[in-house]
Amino acid sequence: MRKSPSIPTILNKNVSFIDSPGCWVFYTFLCLALRVILAGLGLSTSVAWVIVNWFHGIITFFLFHWIKGAPFASDHEHESELLTFWEQIDDQVLYTRARKFLFLFPIALFFIAVDSSGWDLAYFWINSVVLLITVLPKLPFMHRVRLFGINS
């Protein structure tokens, strides 16, 4: 696996898998699989993509930006106990391939969901809320920021 030169050589084992393109393919596959399942249930294309976008947004918000610490014992356990999963990725180095993928994926989902609904205003605003909830915590100025002391 080719690593970015900006990434430290000793990575937190709890998040090192995120840098793998295979992980990105699997991540994309999970969203597409959910879309296929929803289509199989008879939901319209627009509703199915909105649900995929919401599921993705809610799950990634809690997994990446709410839960702190390392789920498995590692050398970085004490260093990461106050960091969210997102903050632990690539040992806090910004603008790596993994972070770019995870930043752009919800934006792509937003455009797919909005476009499949024909740019309907109601769907646009519903998906915009999810986009903000998913992308805003990933921005560099939000690194280690806990709003209103929540989750500190």
Where are these regions (language model features)?
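Cytosolic-side membrane-entry/anchor segment at the start of a transmembrane helix
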Residues: 1-27
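Multipass alpha-helical transmembrane domains of eukaryotic endomembrane proteins
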Residues: 2-12, 60-117, 142-152
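Membrane-lumen (extracellular) interface motif
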Residues: 18-21, 33-52, 112-128, 143-150
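Alpha-helical transmembrane spans of integral membrane proteins, capturing the lipid-embedded, hydrophobic core
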Residues: 20, 24, 28, 32, ...
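Hydrophobic alpha-helical membrane-embedded segments
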Residues: 41-42, 46-71
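Residue-level micro-sites within transmembrane alpha helices that shape
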Residues: 52-55, 99, 105, 126, ...
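Alpha-helical transmembrane segments and their membrane-interface exit regions
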Residues: 55-63, 130-140
